[in-house]
From Swiss-Prot:
Molecular function GO labels: nutrient reservoir activity
Keywords for this protein: Disulfide bond, Seed storage protein, Signal, Storage protein
Function of the protein: This is a seed storage protein.
Compositional bias segments (type: Low complexity): 191-221, 280-298
Keyword Cell membrane applies: no
Entry protein name: 11S globulin seed storage protein G3
Organism of origin: Helianthus annuus
Cysteine disulfide links: 32-65, 103-312
Subunit architecture: Hexamer; each subunit is composed of an acidic and a basic chain derived from a single precursor and linked by a disulfide bond.
The UniProt record lists the keyword Disulfide bond: yes
Amino acid sequence: MASKATLLLAFTLLFATCIARHQQRQQQQNQCQLQNIEALEPIEVIQAEAGVTEIWDAYDQQFQCAWSILFDTGFNLVAFSCLPTSTPLFWPSSREGVILPGCRRTYEYSQEQQFSGEGGRRGGGEGTFRTVIRKLENLKEGDVVAIPTGTAHWLHNDGNTELVVVFLDTQNHENQLDENQRRFFLAGNPQAQAQSQQQQQRQPRQQSPQRQRQRQRQGQGQNAGNIFNGFTPELIAQSFNVDQETAQKLQGQNDQRGHIVNVGQDLQIVRPPQDRRSPRQQQEQATSPRQQQEQQQGRRGGWSNGVEETICSMKFKVNIDNPSQADFVNPQAGSIANLNSFKFPILEHLRLSVERGELRPNAIQSPHWTINAHNLLYVTEGALRVQIVDNQGNSVFDNELREGQVVVIPQNFAVIKRANEQGSRWVSFKTNDNAMIANLAGRVSASAASPLTLWANRYQLSREEAQQLKFSQRETVLFAPSFSRGQGIRASR
C-alpha cells in the first residue's frame, strides 16, 4: 500500500510539474507575440560616488520574450549574483578580481606592513598579512568577461571609464529563484544611494497595475544593503575574530557612497604582468589548432582523456576586438566578430554568446535571422538604422537606434542593419552559446543556394532578372555603401 501511495505521489508531482512547465512555456510564447518592437532605454538611474548604474525594465514584454535583463555600470564593490553575467568592456584599462569557491589560490604573496588598531586583528599590535587573490585579470578595451553564477567579484577602473555593459539571463538554468534580478553585495550600502535618488527618477512609461505590482516586488529584492547588514555585529565579530566596531563597519550602515566608490591611489594589489605581445602572437602562443579541436571534442561529449576542463582552469576573458577573432571582414564595409562556446568555453555554462559588429558609414549587414536564439542589440557608438520583420511579413520595428539604446530581436525574426553617415558599432547578446544566423542576401545566403528556376517562378522573374538577383551580390555578410544604395548591378556592367 505504501508503494502504491508513493507511486501515486510521484505521478502527481510529475503531472503537476508537466502542467507548470506547459503553462510557463505557453506564457513565454504569448510574451513573444510582439506586434510592435520599440527601442528601449533605462527606466532607473542610480548614481554612486564613482559611477552610474542604469537599469532596464525586466518586466518589459520584449525582455520577457528574450528572458533577459540589461544594465550598465561604471570600482564596483565586491558582489555576487544569482545569475551568470557576460561583460564586454569599452574602456582603456581596468582590473578585475574573481573569487572562485573551491579553486586553488592563483596569486599569493606575503608583505611586511605596519597595521594596528581598528585596521588590525583584535588586540591591535603590529604584524604581517598575506594577500590572497583567486583570479586577477588585466582588462583592456574590447575584453569580454564571463562571471559564473554565485561567484564573488570586484572591478576596478584605473583609467577613464566610458561604459560597461552587463547582461543577465533570468531564465538561465542555474537561476533557481524567480525572474527578479538580484545582486548580493558583500560591501557598501547600495540601498542608501538608491533611496536618496528615488524622488529624482524620471517617470517610467504608463504601466498596467499588474506590471506596477511586479515592479514593486522586484524593487523589494533590489538596492538593499550588503549581506552583512542582516547579521548581528556580535556574530560577525566572532566569525571574523575582530571587535564589534570593525564588524559594524562591515555592515556599511553609515556608508553613503553607494555601490561604486572612488579608491584613489589606495588600491595596491599584486597583478599579473601586462602582455606586451601582439594579438597575433598571443593567439599563436595560446593553443594549437589540434589542442583546440581536442578540447572542443571533449566538451561536446566526444572522446576524452578523462581529465575535463573545470571552472577553475577556464578562461574568464577574451578580447573580441582582436582582429584574429573577426569572423567577417570587408575593408569597405566593416567587420563582425562572434564569441561562442567554441572560442570561449565558459559560455557553454552561461548558455550565452556575444557578437561585436562595426559598420562603416552607410554600409549594410545582410538581412538575416538568428536560428536558435533571441538577440539583444545594444549600440555602443554612432547610430544604426534597424528594420525587423515578423513571421507574417509585418514590419515590427523600423527606426534609428542611437548610442545607449537597446532593441530585442526575437528568434527567427528577420533583421537588416545600416549604419548612418558616421558609421556605427554595436554589441549583441544571444541566448544560446552557439547562436547561428542565416542570411537572406549575399554569396553564402539561402537565396544564393536556391535553384535559379525557383527564383524565376516564385518571384515571377525572367531568367535574366533571376540571374542578376542571385549572382549580383558577391559579398558574403557585409555590403559596402555602393551596394546598399542599389548601385551594385550598375557598377558590375
